[in-house]
Amino acid sequence: MSEKWGVIHIYASYNNTIIHVTDITGAETIAKISGGMIVKNQKDESSPYAAMQGAFKIADMIREKGIDKVHIKVRATGGSKSKNPGPGAQAAIRALARAGIKIGRIEDATPIPHDGTTPKKGNR
């Protein structure tokens, strides 16, 4: 039996968590889910609970398509904003592992500026 690999892109900001599954090339979208599709309140979109439920749904979707092994790319907002992933990133990865999906590599895909725009000045 040939094993089919996929790539799970987890975009975790402090406002939302988006889980997006593509094929290994990244060209074709297989499944996509966001925190807002799971919870009612806007304040809960980035919560670990929303990320966990989304990851379980994604695991079911990709299993139907025949993907059993994945690489994970975690991305924070980055740029001149926060370089740390939001609260949903860790929960989503843990939920995927618990759902029985084999995880290959976990890598950080946060964009880092090479002297881009000036960051916001702090309050006095």
Curated annotation (Swiss-Prot):
HAMAP family for the chain: Ribosomal_uS11
Assembly mode: Part of the 30S ribosomal subunit.
Ribonucleoprotein keyword on record: yes
GO molecular function: rRNA binding; structural constituent of ribosome
Protein's UniProt name: Small ribosomal subunit protein uS11
NCBIfam families (alphabetical): arch_S11P, PRK09607.1
GO biological process: translation
KW Coiled coil (keyword) present: no
SUPFAM superfamilies, per the entry: Translational machinery components
InterPro entries, sorted: Ribosomal_uS11 (IPR001971), Ribosomal_uS11_archaeal (IPR019961), Ribosomal_uS11_CS (IPR018102), Ribosomal_uS11_sf (IPR036967)
GO CC term (a single one): ribosome
UniProt feature coiled coil, ranges: none
Organism of derivation: Methanococcus aeolicus (strain ATCC BAA-1280 / DSM 17508 / OCM 812 / Nankai-3)
UniProt superkingdom: Archaea
Function of the molecule: Located on the platform of the 30S subunit.
Family per similarity comment: Belongs to the universal ribosomal protein uS11 family.
Keywords per UniProt: Ribonucleoprotein, Ribosomal protein, RNA-binding, rRNA-binding
Pfam families: Ribosomal_S11
